[in-house]
Amino acid sequence: MRTKYIFITGGVLSSLGKGLAAASIAAVLECRGLRVTNQKLDPYINVDPGTMSPFQHGEVFVTDDGAETDLDLGHYERFTSTRMGKSNNLTTGQVYFSVITKERRGDYLGKTVQVIPHITNEIKDYIRQSSEGFDVALIEIGGTVGDIESLPFLEAIRQFRNEVGKQNAIFIHLTWVPFIKTAGEVKTKPTQHSVKALREIGIQPDILLCRTEEFLSEDIKAKIALFCNVEEAAVFTAKDVSCIYEVPLIYHREGLDQKIVDLLNIWTGQPHLEAWENVVQKITSPSYEVNIAIVGKYVNLTDSYKSLNEALVHGGIGNDCQVNLRFVDSEKIEKDGLNHQLENVDGILVPGGFGNRGIEGMIQVIRYARENKVPFFGICLGMQMAVVEFARHVCGLEKANSSEFDENTPHPVIDLLPEQKAVQEMGASMRLGSYPCRLSDASLACEAYGEVEIGERHRHRYEFNRDYQERLEACGLRITGRSPDGRLVEIVEIKDHPWFLGCQFHPEFKSRPTEPHPLFQRFIEAALRYRKKRAEDQ
């Protein structure tokens, strides 16, 4: 079957949920038996988001092949079975870098290099190459219609549609239909203007997805269709939901997937959505609940930990349990102490991060978890700080630290990877992507995975310093995961604790609602046991 293309744009304002919409459409189409892939075209000039602040961009999602990408690729992976990679995220920076490199090589044979056709051709070539081997490719255009940065991408997809034909490519426009409480009615004018801006650059949407609080009436749909030059049957409600995994089911009930396959002339059966129905049922009607504290430095923007938050929810699904997340700023703990911030918490998770801000607060929290037998899960920086805390307060190495935060520490229990010492550039220069890990028998990690050889994704420069391995192991630290050559420490645990585990990798990137990651599933299971014990002791 020839590849079909679905281009998804957004209007009126940002953060409408284009990524979630693209992922949900892909999920329903995959449930119809189609091979799907997603692409994200980002209009910023950065080559990738790897060096961008989490407060500006949110999470950096790492793929198996080591790409640092937009967080929407995390949505794509969680909603479909397709693994994302470097070819699934294109930025303006990458486009211009490639075109300028070709110009310097002489590929354009002396021509004047321009946005049209050279930049737009580069974008179109990328779309084609990244879609090979799939039945349907969903391409999300970042930003909002009207942004000057998005114009080359919009022009490229306009040309692309003309080249492949209307039965092989469609445009879906996600827009906002606000409900004005004082007037008691929904307003369609923002949508009208958004579509008008899109049509002015030559793109006529085939389908409108209207983000709103409640389902739109037939009268409102008819009005939108009239002013936006689409048929009434092509106006769909993208209703606000409390559970994002309900979105594929809502889209199917609205008939969106049927409309798409009709427009693209795809013959498929009805989708098998039982797995999604089961996920939603377990999230909305759980038998148990736990409170998990996420202690980090980017908690003021929860998108900074998007995959982490979702992986904890997945762990709850695997235990028929609602997971209540409590975000705790580690920098505030440094200033004010614990101050009841961990009261009634059933598990503590310290996630990854960079820089020394808030690390002493993390160490206080880890000590609390260790001494009070609270289930603890440390990821990347969280694992490193667990090692520092153990070295200081159990092994008596009072000034132990990571050389990232104190170059003059007498005990650098966490140190720079040897291959990183000569690295000068920041972008895409860390230990990135999937690496194998060998687990020790009779460990929490091996018990969770059920195997001794695993592969997980990494994003770090610093590692456990093996010069301190013997000293820390003598005090009760267990190294239960190593690289196959034994050179790098990947997982640590401690003796005499019900569940205390730190890993150097990022397991959250491989968790799905239909396949919860084993470490998150076991962490939530341990939190449930702790909650039950806490209730019995009261």
From Swiss-Prot:
Positions contributing to UTP binding: 14, 187-192, 223
Enzyme active site: 380, 506, 508
HAMAP family: PyrG (MF_01227)
Region (Amidoligase domain): 1-266
EC number: 6.3.4.2
GO terms, molecular function: ATP binding; CTP synthase activity; glutaminase activity; identical protein binding; metal ion binding
Entry binding sites for CTP: 14, 147-149, 187-192, 223
Gene responsible for this protein: pyrG
Assembly with partners or alone: Homotetramer.
Binding site for L-glutamine: 353, 381-384, 404, 461
Reaction(s) catalysed by this chain's protein: UTP + L-glutamine + ATP + H2O = CTP + L-glutamate + ADP + phosphate + 2 H(+); L-glutamine + H2O = L-glutamate + NH4(+); UTP + NH4(+) + ATP = CTP + ADP + phosphate + 2 H(+)
Source species of the chain: Syntrophus aciditrophicus (strain SB)
Reported function: Catalyzes the ATP-dependent amination of UTP to CTP with either L-glutamine or ammonia as the source of nitrogen. Regulates intracellular CTP levels through interactions with the four ribonucleotide triphosphates.
Pfam families on file: CTP_synth_N, GATase
Positions that bind Mg(2+): 72, 140
Protein name: CTP synthase
Residues covered by the Glutamine amidotransferase type-1 domain: 291-533
Family designation: Belongs to the CTP synthase family.
Keywords: ATP-binding, Glutamine amidotransferase, Ligase, Magnesium, Metal-binding, Nucleotide-binding, Pyrimidine biosynthesis
GO cellular component terms given for this protein: cytosol
GO biological process: 'de novo' CTP biosynthetic process; pyrimidine nucleobase biosynthetic process
Entry binding sites for ATP: 15-20, 72, 239-241
Other facts: CTPSs have evolved a hybrid strategy for distinguishing between UTP and CTP. The overlapping regions of the product feedback inhibitory and substrate sites recognize a common feature in both compounds, the triphosphate moiety. To differentiate isosteric substrate and product pyrimidine rings, an additional pocket far from the expected kinase/ligase catalytic site, specifically recognizes the cytosine and ribose portions of the product inhibitor.
Leading EC class: ligase
Pathway(s) served: Pyrimidine metabolism; CTP biosynthesis via de novo pathway; CTP from UDP: step 2/2
